């Protein structure tokens, strides 16, 4: 799990750049905000063990995943 932690751990500046990229790529700022929140909520209930570890909050993970989907379209899943 240590490699997973290092892979997903990013600093706040990088996280803000990713948030801005998501907002800029979206036609509707409200909709992308709701999509990120829904993904974080879904992740929270799907993986309760990750919450107990406490190394990454679901909202940060959702932003990272969704911004990766912008840059790497082959990993886009069903939404």
Swiss-Prot record:
Keyword Oxidoreductase attributed: no
Catalytic activity: RNA(n) + a ribonucleoside 5'-triphosphate = RNA(n+1) + diphosphate
Keyword ATP-binding: no
Enzyme Commission numbers on file: 2.7.7.6
SUPFAM superfamilies in the record: RPB6/omega subunit-like (SSF63562)
Cellular component GO terms held in the UniProt record: DNA-directed RNA polymerase complex
GO molecular function: DNA binding; DNA-directed RNA polymerase activity
A GO BP annotation: DNA-templated transcription
InterPro entries according to UniProt: DNA-dir_RNA_pol_omega, Pol_omega/Rpo6/RPB6, RPB6/omega-like_sf
Alphabetically ordered keywords of this record: DNA-directed RNA polymerase, Nucleotidyltransferase, Transcription, Transferase
Function: Promotes RNA polymerase assembly. Latches the N- and C-terminal regions of the beta' subunit thereby facilitating its interaction with the beta and alpha subunits.
Family assignment from sequence similarity: Belongs to the RNA polymerase subunit omega family.
Assembly information from the UniProt record: In cyanobacteria the RNAP catalytic core is composed of 2 alpha, 1 beta, 1 beta', 1 gamma and 1 omega subunit. When a sigma factor is associated with the core the holoenzyme is formed, which can initiate transcription.
Protein name: DNA-directed RNA polymerase subunit omega
Name of the coding gene: rpoZ
């Amino acid at each position: 799990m240590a490699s997973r932690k290092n892979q997903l751990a990013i600093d706040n500046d990088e996280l803000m750049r990713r948030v801005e990229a998501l907002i800029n790529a979206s036609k509707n700022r409200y909709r992308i905000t709701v999509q990120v929140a829904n993904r974080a909520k879904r992740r929270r209930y799907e993986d309760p063990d990750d919450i107990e570890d406490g190394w990454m909050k679901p909202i940060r993970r959702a932003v990272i995943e969704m911004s990766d989907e912008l840059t790497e379209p082959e990993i886009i899943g069903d939404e």
